[in-house]
């Protein structure tokens, strides 16, 4: 028996993003991808490529069972939510490819003119990853985003915030008062957490 695909829209703390949650797995557990343009999605995610045909779509983030879409400021969600929800639902229902292959990790794609920071493996990496996975990732995913641990060096934990967390007005507070305090409590060696 085929279970019909359902997709519902869920607001996030970031007013420019909306989370579209499916009753089907879109990617493997722990996998996520983010695309800032149709060109970035080309050859990786046909779903994201098609979503960029909507003129108001600025970013597409896909993970286990949801797609988070970031829109331009000039169109209210009231006018586009149903159209996007139906599009995602129909794409999944028709068996359209969500992802053909994983792109190179986002941490290895520097912004133009910026160098990529390469972190040495530290004795704290596993403990930090475990704390982020257990306490932080579920809450961040619930808000339509993701957190990626990039490295630890001299008391500083560096992470990447993705999906609805990227550019969210409350992400700085979450980072400093939530994540940083949690890591400091469990690992006194941690002095600060920064996002890139």
Predicted regions and their residues:
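Domain-level signature for proteins that mediate thiol-based redox and metal-cofactor handling
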Residues: 1-196
